[in-house]
């Protein structure tokens, strides 16, 4: 009994509460963003000022031509605005104007608006917007699947997606449009997963006038308005992102399908109101950010600019293959699987590409089997982009960029779904009991992360070395004599030979000197000028040839 009393008199040990470390997954997104930043900002000046990308070169010329308006009233004046490329000689401009406005004003702020400067500003802006897309794919995964780890893995895949890395090294409008698109998709996910106010069946119904329901009831109107604004920004960045508009009513339908039947009547009215207001706000934002799609000159002068429509129609004709242009001939006889093949092999890399495509098929099957409320938004967006671009005449990899973050999310979902399905799925292999599904999930995760990292590192290594055509050209200039050759002696004793062009019909005389502007390759001493061959005219009908 004494022993029993001693036991009873012992103080009870306090049970420790488990430490909540779920926050660490949210903090690790910073690490993922730093990884993505390294891939995107390494070697931004990869072509060392040669402007090798044709679309980027065009945008660079446009950027150096436009300039901020002196008065705010000039901004909407399509015929006179200094921000309108059409007024400055670029009459075929089919890109969104919001990205060039952003880059130009950032360049003004940094004092980097010259031809050899503004494209680097544009590349940095492009990379920064893609980092924002990575953040939103993390938020989408965390919100949609209630799993921060799933969102983090999706963000890591997106950070290492090679096409996203490549586009971030170009000054183009694609990353800006993609950022606003995925910000809008995140808002759409928030709408479809929103919870309605709890309904008490015992409570007496209260009559609320229609006007009060329309103007005073919430109904998640803020989310709809944010989506509308983001869609307007995306459309003003790239008009071909128009399919994004369908995701808002789709999110509303999914939200509506989850409501109790006795509350759907009131909610449907609010949903229609929200959709209309979101559409109005989208139009207003587009009017502000793509002002020259309208004639102006005032904000309320919203007659469509037919010159802008004509440019879009011309682009559509070229993209359809109806007109033969040299740069579109490459798309002839391309199979319908061409875009998908390039996405898997090059854009994502084989491990991530295969996993993403497998996850896409699996998610589609889950959607058909009844799990559509969770998957239809992301899967439908991915399927629409993949199908339409695969059937388009121009099947450029860049046109599939809007589905890349979604494919990364789907690949991450496939890994976690496989792990989830592995609960209890134990098989005996010889003397070992193996949960083969979870083992497969781990193998898939390790192989995909390692493969994607290796592919991203190998690709980014391109930007740390001279571009081959630039290196070859510099070797030619250095080792093969030109019409005019300038030996430039450096302090280290090495001589740099710079060749200059010379027009074969030009004449040298005291009265008519040959003038040629160039930038010296080295800031050192010019030791001479070599003319490889000169024809000296000493009479009207005779010439003598003298080597220089």
Regions found by a protein language model. Give the residues of each.
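Transmembrane-helix signature of polytopic, membrane-embedded enzymes
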Residues: 31-32, 137-160, 202, 208-218, ...
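Signature aromatic-anchored transmembrane alpha helix within multi-pass, membrane-resident enzymes
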Residues: 30, 409, 414-457
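Perimembrane helix-loop-helix junctions
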Residues: 6, 187-219, 230-231, 244-283, ...
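Membrane-interface alpha helices of multi-pass inner-membrane proteins
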Residues: 210-238, 340-342, 385-390
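Hydrophobic/aromatic-rich transmembrane helices and adjacent perimembrane loops
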Residues: 167-168, 174-178, 234, 239, ...
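Short helix- or helix-capping micro-motifs
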Residues: 36, 154-159, 186, 231, ...
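Transmembrane-helix motifs of polytopic, lipid-linked glycan transferases
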Residues: 124-145, 183-187, 358-360, 364
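Transmembrane-lumen/periplasm boundary regions of multi-pass, lipid-linked membrane glycan transferases
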Residues: 59-74, 78-81, 85-114, 118, ...
